[in-house]
Amino acid sequence: MNNYFIGKVLSGHHINNNGNGNTLSRTALTPTNNNVNRGDLVTNGLTPIDNNFIGSNGFIPRNVTRKDPFRKRTTQEFIREWTEWKEKSASLFTAPIVGVITSTLLEALKKLVAGRVLMSLTNLLFPNNSTSTMEEILRATEQYIQEQLDTVTWNRVSQELEGLKNDLRTFNDQIDDFLQNRVGISPLAIIDSINTMQQLFVNRLPQFQVSDDQVLLLPLFAQAVTLHLTFVRDIIINADEWNIPEAQLNTYKRYLKQYVAQYSNYALSTYEEAFRARFYPRNTVENMLEFKTFMTLNVLDLVSMWSLLKYVNLYVSTSANLYNIGDNKVNEGEYSISYWPFFNTYIQTKSNYVLSGVSGYAMRWSYTNPFFGEYIQDHLYNITASYIGGVNGPQIGQQLSTTELDQLVQQQARADIPVDFTQIPINCTLRNPLEVPYYATRFNELTSLGTAGVGGFVRSDVFISNDSVCGLGTNYSSGQTFYPDYYITNISATVQVNGTNTDISPLYFGENRAITSTNGVNKVIAIYNRKTNYDDFTNIRGTIVHEAPTDSTGFTISPLHLDTVNINSYLYIQENYGNNGDSLRVINRAIIKYRLSAARSVIYRLVLRVSGTASSIVAIYENYPVGSANQINTGTDNEGVIDNDSKFIDLIFNTPFSVSGTARELQLQVSGATTSSPLDIMNIILIPINDVPLY
């Protein structure tokens, strides 16, 4: 038999690879001679390694660059993009309609003019007067959870969907009749229609909260709640046009606040209970991230927007993270739920920087084994993310010195009979991180068949932008994981379990704590986020500079996207489930600065969503005080929503300020927070001066 690796055995640290050009696949076979059998077969001779290949990677989604984040989008665009995603990307059984609904609702929040969001959502969720789309959400959840409703419950839920569809259709028709004055309907009749629809919602929502099937029904519940809340919001926003009396209007404002809290608490507590139960006593990080991603897409993204429905004319630039994680199984390890807070902080510790590249070190070993024959084994030893401004994240895995490499070679030689090995440095750098970021990844572990049977594994850890495909094993698998309107904001990894105790205390914000393992990296992880409004000055400062919308729309800022803080160890990341991302926890007196830019002058008021206690918060814009709050205690004064023990209030600072120019400073000074009584900054909201929250 002919060897495909030529040269001196263990002759040195160099590439020595004569391959026949075939690519790897999961079902491939190994030829037993030098003849090329078929183009889809695995061979022991691999195609030359090129871990920074520039060129086309086949399918490219529609929205892969961050250009023009404020442009108006249409529902048809959302339908095309999410349908395309379902066909081309790993989808965790998620129905594309859930992404369409979220995108449509985000677009609706940006509009100042009155409108009928309920009618738009009704047409999307019940197209052609059918319940099939809502049933698709339920079936997808059953597939992912791997449980099914019993026949009786399924039939009851189907009947409720049919009833809800008919009720919505009747209500929308009645509003149409009133607005078009086709039948001379009086305002009193419209009020009757509104009150009837309100009662129908109140009666039907409990049918999606069946005690033994709460998790299965949660995505359906989230859609039904969104319909109810947008119904109430439409009434408030259109009160003048619909001739709604002031007393009735105040009632529905009270309803909006009441139902946001009631529905949010049910959804958040159901999710948290399911997350903890699913991973008790132990489970893999892969399962944790897949469950969180599924629930974010299907439930938590909507919950995050419910509490923002009281605002109009608002661009929501923040989002919870989505994930893609490798499927490697070697030395994977399982963790208890207590590991999660540590993990959630280390994958976000550089959240205020923009990802610019990935580096790492791998080796590809080839062996001759009496049982497997010749086979290949990949080993990824370490990986590090880099960011604009020359900033590096923590190194994850094992850093090999020359001595350690020589020892490793000898250790491998004792374990088997190596034919040769190849060093594979990974150096991926984005050409334009702001406008052309990584938007997709491909993480696979592929079986490398030996000449006498199953052998080792080869890895594909690939990062994809609009103009590059880079990483380990760029030629060995196809497919990609992406999400419409999301971009990759960080690359991280888990390490292979080797019995050593890891410090799993949560990282303070910005901490560079190396995550080590003598066995190296196990799974690479991509973190996706919806953030797009980066000002070009980010390239100069390194940290994020937030660009204000060009049409005087309000906008949100993630508290994690800060510029500087007086002492980093005073800040931590606090997980929230329904908050468009996590909070910034303050445990001591902190001075936190953010940077804003605007192409033209826009006058805003500042709203801070906070949870916890502090003696004071002072907000200063360009050395100009814009507001303060004293003796904050949201345990007794809050909006009724409980999100991972956070009870929040929106503090509105009424002093207006003009955002104009580049990299202007917004400073938050927090006093009186402690480790035992922290203050969480959950969201930073800038609303146009003349906009008033609905409640």
From Swiss-Prot:
The keyword DNA-binding is annotated on this UniProt entry: no
Pfam families found in the cross-reference section: Endotoxin_C (PF03944), Endotoxin_mid (PF09131), Endotoxin_N (PF03945)
Record's keyword terms, sorted: Sporulation, Toxin, Virulence
GO process terms (BP): sporulation resulting in formation of a cellular spore; symbiont-mediated killing of host cell
Gene Ontology molecular function: signaling receptor binding; toxin activity
Keyword Calcium appears in the UniProt entry: no
PANTHER family, per database record: ENDOTOXIN_N DOMAIN-CONTAINING PROTEIN-RELATED (PTHR37003), PESTICIDAL CRYSTAL PROTEIN N-TERMINAL DOMAIN-CONTAINING PROTEIN (PTHR37003:SF2)
Family listed: Belongs to the delta endotoxin family.
Function of the protein: Binds to the brush border membrane vesicles of scarab larvae and damages the gut wall somehow to allow the vegetative cells of P.popilliae to enter the hemolymph.
Record protein name field: Parasporal crystal protein Cry18Ca
Species of the source: Paenibacillus popilliae (Bacillus popilliae)
